[in-house]
């Protein structure tokens, strides 16, 4: 980055006026002269050369006020040949216009520089003073909070400087006041209202010298959000929220959601909270007592948002109107073996599948219900 002339302080203005007067004398006489007199530590400096004649055969730059061989920094023979000298540090080169480029510039680069230009049968010399300045301390920035909740929290950032020409960057993009962002009249404070998950970084920048910019550190924001949705994926796949699986088979379920930060998972089976907190559940060998409805609940403790999704596991051909009734209370008709216990009369239902197609009850024309006898009961009655 090319550096321009200094400003503000009295001694810099005096120095600038002296340089301009010297340049005017050089211009009047048609001689080459050095125009660049200011550099910034750590940046690129161009010790600019002006009034250069045509058909230059060689540019030679020297450290100090004379062009002795021991002081040579670098020489350049157009179009491309460059020869380093004893004072070469590896940071210097000569551009097409014959100016000396130094990058990065150091404080000890301050001093006189002499250039010798050979063009045809003529050799011209010029000497100029380069002053290298150091920028102030690093630009400071502070925020009132860095851990936030989307659409709920706001953040205020302060640029710690006395300069009022401040540029604010959000996600490395220059920003200005808007419906969601406000910059104070002095430019030193940026407020982001209702932060978004896409607000990732904040930074401020000032122009310390013309075309010389200082940036603060980049502040990272942690914005919690979600869950936006929750899905319950299963293997075997579910159909309309129902997973069909055989007894003894494997069933896998996974709770999927889009959220940030760490989530908490809860599983509920037939209304009972399970002691299980992972996103994935694996039923390696499905049992009857594992049939029924499962609910995966996802909780973001930071945003305090909760979402859930249900799925039902059932056996093939299971009748949804039958399965919830695991016990039947019946009026007893007919001579069917039974016994009484503390709960009253209880039938020995011989079907191993409570939702089997085999009828357990018979209904006569009057509406009375009787138990369908087992085959062994029929044999026993026939032998009497």
UniProtKB/Swiss-Prot annotation:
Residues 1-30 form the signal peptide. Keywords: Disulfide bond, Glycoprotein, Immunoglobulin domain, Signal. It comes from the Eukaryota. Glycans are attached at residues 108, 112, 121, 162, 270. Residues 358-384 are annotated as: Disordered. Residues 227-314 form the Ig-like C2-type domain. SMART domains: IG, IGc2. Residues 359-369 have a biased composition (Polar residues). Residues 373-384 have a biased composition (Basic and acidic residues). The keyword Glycoprotein applies. Disulfide bonds join 255-296. Belongs to the immunoglobulin superfamily. CEA family. This is Cell adhesion molecule CEACAM18. It comes from Homo sapiens. The lineage of its organism: Eukaryota, Metazoa, Chordata, Craniata, Vertebrata. The gene is CEACAM18.
